[in-house]
Amino acid sequence: MSVLVYFSSSSENTHRFVKKLCIPAKRIPLIDKKEFQIKSPYILVIPSYNNGILDTAVPHQVTNFLNTLHNKFFLKGVIGSGNKNFGVNFCIAGNIISKKYKVPLLYKFELLGTNKDVINVKNGINKFWKKLNLEKKNQNA
């Protein structure tokens, strides 16, 4: 089964949102103790930090995680979290990851997300995996 992989700081905003989804998820550790590897396709849920300043918007833990070949290979999409106070840099980390790794930015939500965000993300994830599996089947035909 495909999973979500997410990073959440000690504020736990992203963690609380992911828990509301009731979808299997793995958390990128706050402290890089050892290499964290994913061995199946996943969607990354990533918050933006440092007021959306481009150089530091992607948490270093996420950068380290994506520098591992397996983790980079299995990344299929990204969901961004942020604060609308960042203005044009709202969810900028999601945009950065999407462009750098050439995966779709599937959704953006603010802070803890709303109930509507939870429903939209769950439905969007289901549609995304179905579409991805259909494309894969067509390529193998």
Swiss-Prot record:
GO terms for molecular function: FMN binding. Coiled coil: none annotated. GO terms for biological process: protein modification process. It comes from the Bacteria. Probably involved in ribonucleotide reductase function. NCBIfam families: nrdI. Belongs to the NrdI family. This is Protein NrdI. The lineage of its organism: Bacteria, Pseudomonadati, Pseudomonadota, Gammaproteobacteria, Enterobacterales.
